[in-house]
UniProtKB/Swiss-Prot annotation:
Quaternary data: Domain-swapped homodimer. Component of an interferon-dependent multiprotein complex, at least composed of IFIT1, IFIT2 and IFIT3. Interacts with IFIT1 and IFIT3. Interacts with STING1/MITA and disrupts its interaction with MAVS or TBK1. Interacts with EIF3C.
Protein origin, superkingdom: Eukaryota
InterPro entries xrefs: TPR-like_helical_dom_sf, TPR_rpt
Organism: Mus musculus
Oxidoreductase as UniProt keyword: no
Its job: IFN-induced antiviral protein which inhibits expression of viral messenger RNAs lacking 2'-O-methylation of the 5' cap. The ribose 2'-O-methylation would provide a molecular signature to distinguish between self and non-self mRNAs by the host during viral infection. Viruses evolved several ways to evade this restriction system such as encoding their own 2'-O-methylase for their mRNAs or by stealing host cap containing the 2'-O-methylation (cap snatching mechanism). Binds AU-rich viral RNAs, with or without 5' triphosphorylation, RNA-binding is required for antiviral activity.
Protein name (record): Interferon-induced protein with tetratricopeptide repeats 2
Record family assignment: Belongs to the IFIT family.
Pfam families: TPR_19
Amino acid sequence: MSTTSKESLVCNLRQLKCHFTWNLIAEDESLDEFEDRVFNKDEFQNSEFKATMCNILAYVKHCRGLNEAALQCLGEAEGFIQQQHPDQVEIRSLVTWGNYAWVYYHMGQFSKAQAYLDKVKQVCKKFSSPYRIENPALDCEEGWARLKCTKNQNERVKVCFQKALEKDPKNPEFTSGWAIAFYRLDDWPARNYCIDSLEQAIQLSPDNTYVKVLLALKLDAVHVHKNQAMALVEEALKKDPSAIDTLLRAARFYCKVYDTDRAIQLLRKALEKLPNNAYVHYYMGCCYRSKVHHMLNRREMVFSGDRKKLEELIQLAVNHLRKAEEIKEMLEYSCSFLADLYIIAKKYDEADYYFQKELSKDLPPGPKQLLHLRYGNFQFFQMKRQDKAIYHYMEGVKIKKKTIPQKKMREKLQRIALRRLHEDESDSEALHILAFLQENGGGQQADKDSERGVDSANQVPSASLDEDGAEY
């Protein structure tokens, strides 16, 4: 193929609406992270999205240099389109054909790439456009792809489904996608609007169990219609007790309403289908960890000799969290939660190992602060290493993000400093801590006449093994 012909081919390929032109992988995201998020998170694991998932998988296979495998995935996508959309095969196949054209282009098989471009062109010409048309089915497919693949494009997703609804306002699939996009946007626009959109989607798709559970979660979040929320979840589970995305969201609902036993029951069902899914093991571990802390809060149970039950729960939590960590090492909080459980079990070497592992991760500011708070507490209370506790509290305060953990670390540092000054007015480390607090956003000056300083002198940092991510 001549240079001019190749440039023309590329120009036409760029006009296609398909996964190769939608910029689905964020610039700061690795292919491994992208693939894990797309194929292991809980949304859209069910049969109605098989064609969509095959197209996404084909794109991932190509990115990994597995073009033959990509072609096989596209062939499977064509088969699912014919099964699920027999009345719209041509329109629904445009994205798949576009992906075919791009894969063959990258394989150097330009004639085959052109053949698929021609197939797209034949359909688009019916709408007076060479390679790109405005069609609600295409907007819908782009919306599902972005909803599944992207992290921060929910506004763009909403626009895709909104465009589709302008042409077909009562379409159940478009309405469901639009409602899910609003759910993802969470607090903006107002939650009542999100609830309205989910209710509208259910009216048009009464069998959509996933949307029912999303509505239940939203109703619970705004603290209204608790009975309706519970009824929606039970109805969804009765209608389709094996749908993975419904099971996982329902488990999340039961966690939020403090029914961890029911959540664990649903997660066990999910594990039967996804035995090596890190996220399901992680959620299971978190549920068992929640039961551990609930039992610890009921101190009379521990003191009355029910230590064996506590140890069993700790081991179940550890087993699932370790399994999750083995499958996917970068899960947020997994190592911190393991460290927490080992502290409760008084296995401090194991706890320190997982704290160190978590510290080695590249965490966002909020989780990093929380980690320094937890590790500082561990050093102060369990290891009796005040120097190391001070170091980690300071490291957490240095992170320029106002959070509850940061506030707690300031308070802990101030109490440590004031207590030391109460014992020795010239304690250089205590004076250094107070100067550090002043330099990093304020703190109490070393003033021996300060009533607050005297009152604080005999206090120590408060201990909390269960200082969770909800704090920041």
